[in-house]
Regions:
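Intrinsically disordered, low-complexity, Lys/Arg-biased terminal tails
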Residues: 94, 98-153
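Compositionally biased, intrinsically disordered low-complexity regions enriched for acidic
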Residues: 1-86, 90, 102, 123-143
């Protein structure tokens, strides 16, 4: 019988493998989550992040860089167990707090693992699109932008 080996992520230093390509400030400037991720609750974040940010109190698809809706509903996030009490808005909220220096090891490990797994969408764009064809796979490009990967590949 063939043994199946699972990659043991626990042995990895999660902080070393986490290398986002975009800062929260840059992501907000480019246009993510229809501009409405935080609503009006932005006081805990640096003001400089919002100087050129595309923000709105309600979701506005025209504020997304690729003008498409990308991602799943909040209800789906909750159903999948992707929302934690520490970051009730989800991954991007965690990322912003992480960038600002907050560390909660068990949450960081989960979120960094989720970020790492999202790279499959970068690979899909690279395999299926001509380099620089920003009209190709716009939904995936918007999604990887919302996960701090460079969508301009």
């Amino acid at each position: 019988m063939k043994k199946v080996y699972k990659k043991n992520m626990e042995n990895l230093d999660f902080y070393k493998i986490f290398k986002p390509q975009l800062s929260p400030k840059k992501m907000l400037e480019l246009g993510i989550f229809g501009g409405s991720y935080f609503g009006s609750n932005i006081k805990e974040y640096p003001k400089s992040w919002f100087e050129k940010a595309k923000i709105s109190k309600t979701f506005d698809i025209t504020l997304n860089r690729f003008r498409v809706k990308a991602g799943l509903s909040r209800e789906h996030w909750i159903e999948k167990g992707w929302i934690f009490k520490e970051d009730p808005l989800g991954w991007f909220q965690w990322y912003c707090r992480f960038i600002n220096g907050r560390r909660i090891t068990h949450i960081d490990e989960i979120q960094i693992k989720r970020w790492k797994n999202f790279k499959r969408h970068v690979t899909a764009i690279e395999k299926n699109c001509e380099r620089g064809d920003l009209g190709c796979r716009k939904r995936q490009r918007q999604a990887i932008l919302q996960w701090a990967y460079n969508p301009f590949i």
